[in-house]
Amino acid sequence: GSEMCIRDSNDNKVLYDFFATGEYDRNRDFILTTSPSMDILISSNLERLIYRIAGNDAAKNQELMSELKSQGRYGITDEMKKQLADFYGNYATEEENAATIKKLYEDTGYIIDTHTGVAATVYEKYKKDTGDTTKTVIASTASPYKFTRSVLTAIDPKYDSMGDFELVDELNRLSGVDIPKAIEDIRTAPVLHDTVCEVNEMCDNVKRILGIN
């Protein structure tokens, strides 16, 4: 059978909508989720795919990217959309992601991070939608230790009352996976920056920290 590329999104599902409709529209609310690396309105990688499905037409590619910049949206032709037939797209809500993390832990004892949770959720949707049971490897892109609170509260809400390093120790106990040295070292590392500022003060604060007038 043909190979499929499974494309997953979180609640910021601009890419899901693009693959479903052929229209890319960033004019929407930006949602903060527990999988922040996927919190996007503009996909930096999609431009390369657009170039390919436009027949390596740099001028067409530039036209669409200019539309995105000026209008916040663009649409591809039916001919271009046909070339996306090997892509399956879906998305995972915050609730679905948390449920996947919890179920996988309860079924296997393995704890995944929130981005892998999105992938695993969408993979299950893919299997349900297509009936394809091909053996599939999901490559985790991050350690659950980077997202201890989100991961553990998905397993049990009681963990939300614990401190950050208590959560690190609890994740170690539940998973049996060693605490990464970089995180272990934070326990005793001196706090270098403790400035809290408003968004409109960020530029001035960065300049001050760097000694730039």
Role assignments for model-derived ranges:
Residues 39-49, 109-119, 139-146:
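Conserved phosphate/anionic-ligand binding catalytic regions in large, soluble enzymes, centered on
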Residues 117-213:
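C-terminal non-catalytic interaction/assembly regions of soluble proteins
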Residues 11-16, 144-147:
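Short gly/pro/ser/thr-enriched loop/turn and capping motifs at secondary-structure boundaries
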Residues 7-10, 139:
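Generic beta-sheet signal
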Residues 52-130, 187-199:
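Active-site-adjacent helical/loop segments in soluble small-molecule enzymes
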Residues 1-6:
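Short, small-residue-biased leader/transition segments that mark boundaries at the very start
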Residues 29-61, 188-213:
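C-terminal domain-closing interface element
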Residues 16-48, 158-164, 173-188, 192:
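A structural-propensity feature for long, helix-poor, extended segments
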